[in-house]
Amino acid sequence: MSTVSVKVVTRIRPQNKIESSRGGKPCVTVQRDGTEVFLSTDDEGEYRFTFDRVFGPTSKQKDVFEYIGRPVIDSIFKGYNGTIFAYGQTSSGKTHTMSGPDGSIGEPEHRGVIPRCIAYIFEKFGEADEHIEFTVQTSFMEIYLERVKDLLNIEKSNLPIR
């Protein structure tokens, strides 16, 4: 298990087709060491942000999984709880990172963190002693405008936060 309880990672998603077709220009630069991001603005200059790790727009889904997904699953199999939390504004790349780009469900190379974690969990089941029994619980929630929605049960919306 890592000696750090929480890691903060950012992923700069690639421009989508609409952004590219409209002549959009990247405003974020990733520092070579992979821990800093520079955000340039036309009117206010440049801002610098530091993270445990930064994945740029050319990063591979596999690399993101290897850094954040695999260690969490390994820790879970050692008895710890694990959470991977995606946060960001609308269209910032949460779904791209967690699930994969639109239309990529059948393309293993483009699978996001969630399908890779699920595959890895079942791989770990296969490696375990046959007498060990596993129980898996998962939840997928969206918090938007301070409303919580269960993404696995569309009838459960505006859930209380405890």
Where are each of the predicted segments found?
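Microtubule-binding structural modules
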Residues: 1-162
